[in-house]
Curated annotation (Swiss-Prot):
Listed PROSITE patterns: RIBOSOMAL_S17
CC per GO annotation: cytosolic small ribosomal subunit
Entry keyword set: Ribonucleoprotein, Ribosomal protein, RNA-binding, rRNA-binding
Quaternary organization: Part of the 30S ribosomal subunit.
Single GO biological process annotation from the record: translation
Job of this protein: One of the primary rRNA binding proteins, it binds specifically to the 5'-end of 16S ribosomal RNA.
Protein name: Small ribosomal subunit protein uS17
Assigned protein family: Belongs to the universal ribosomal protein uS17 family.
Gene Ontology terms, MF aspect: rRNA binding; structural constituent of ribosome
Length: 87
């Protein structure tokens, strides 16, 4: 169980749920610029395994690093923290 605590855990927003058992999660982070010392926003998309297809487009989710599940999937869904409001 201690090995799982060393895995990376990110929080992001689902931007695509069109694939079966796979979602695309956009994770936004901030880094400081070396020269100017200003915070710069970076974003990255991760393909994530969603076994039961519970996450929908716009949901805020937590994902965890795992073994390679396919050519592009390296993360799995931990939980849906906030559901999207559908208007």
């Amino acid at each position: 169980m201690t090995e799982r605590n060393d895995r990376k855990v990110y929080t992001g927003r689902v931007v695509s749920d069109k694939m079966d058992k796979t979602i695309t999660v956009l994770v936004e982070t901030y880094k400081f610029h070396k020269l100017y010392g200003k915070r710069v926003k970076y974003s990255k998309k991760f393909k994530t395994h969603d076994e039961n297809n519970v996450a929908k487009n716009g949901d805020v989710v937590r994902i965890m690093e795992t073994r390679p599940l396919s050519a592009t999937k390296r993360f799995r869904l931990v939980e849906v923290t906030e559901e999207a409001v559908i208007i």
